[in-house]
Regions:
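Generic structural marker for isolated residues within well-ordered, non-membrane alpha-helices
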Residues: 1, 23, 45, 157, ...
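Single conserved hydrophobic/aromatic residue that forms the stacking wall/gate
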Residues: 1-12
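ATP-dependent carboxylate activation and anion-phosphoryl transfer catalytic cores
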Residues: 6, 16, 29, 52-55, ...
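A conserved helix-loop-beta module that forms one wall/lid of the active-site cleft
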Residues: 10-69
Length: 202
């Protein structure tokens, strides 16, 4: 009604979509996230890069499909990619994330009622982390993750959904490197993987 999301209250929607609020929530829940920063200018971006190091994942705010998302290996690439990201979303800061090397990217889709949730599936990307999910093939069930890792992914996904008071579908993207699990982002809505998961599990 009136274009409002039925699955998530405004406060929790802002918490999921606002980078600073989301980072604070993950910290409170003892969940890992790649180190990151927000930059409104090239100078700020360079300062952040010197804190985080390279490579860095550069992406504009509030865009879909991985548009203008690039991995910068040098300050020169950072400056070029930053301008492109700012051009795509000029009203919002550019997101800079530590690039998690040698990681497996994972999508988790779940359905929640505000308190409890059920996982639809855990999908493992075939490409290495850093290729946007819209451009990446994935497999279900995951083929290289241990049972311990799968249980931990489920725990973290349900914990996050509960604390965001999600009512409806939610997609969470993870990067798994050895025994470390990083949360890349959480989207309290249906993702492109939902039809695939739905058909796979019947």
């Amino acid at each position: 009604d009136n274009g409002r999301s039925r699955g998530l209250g405004d406060v929790y929607k802002r918490q999921a979509e606002n980078r600073e609020s989301f980072a604070n929530l993950l910290k409170d829940l003892n969940l890992l996230q790649p180190k990151n920063g927000l930059a409104n200018s090239q100078l700020e971006a360079l300062e952040i890069s010197r804190q985080l190091g390279f490579p860095l994942l550069i992406r504009p705010s509030y865009v879909l499909g991985g548009r203008a998302m690039m991995v910068a290996e040098t300050e020169e690439e950072l400056q070029h990619f930053f301008e492109e990201a700012l051009r795509v979303s000029p009203e919002h800061p550019v997101l800079l994330d530590e690039f998690v090397k040698d990681a497996v990217e994972v999508d988790v889709d779940l359905l929640a009622d505000g308190e409890n949730s059920e996982l639809g599936g855990i999908l493992e990307h075939i490409e290495s982390a850093g290729v946007h999910s819209g451009d990446s093939a994935c497999v279900f069930p995951p083929h290289s993750l241990s049972e311990k890792t799968l249980l931990e992914l489920e725990r973290q996904a349900k914990l996050l959904a509960k604390n965001l008071k999600v009512r409806g579908l939610m997609n969470i993207q993870f990067a798994v490197r050895d025994s470390e699990i990083f949360i890349i982002e959480a989207n309290p809505r249906a993702s492109r993987t939902v039809p695939f998961v739905s058909k796979s599990i019947g």
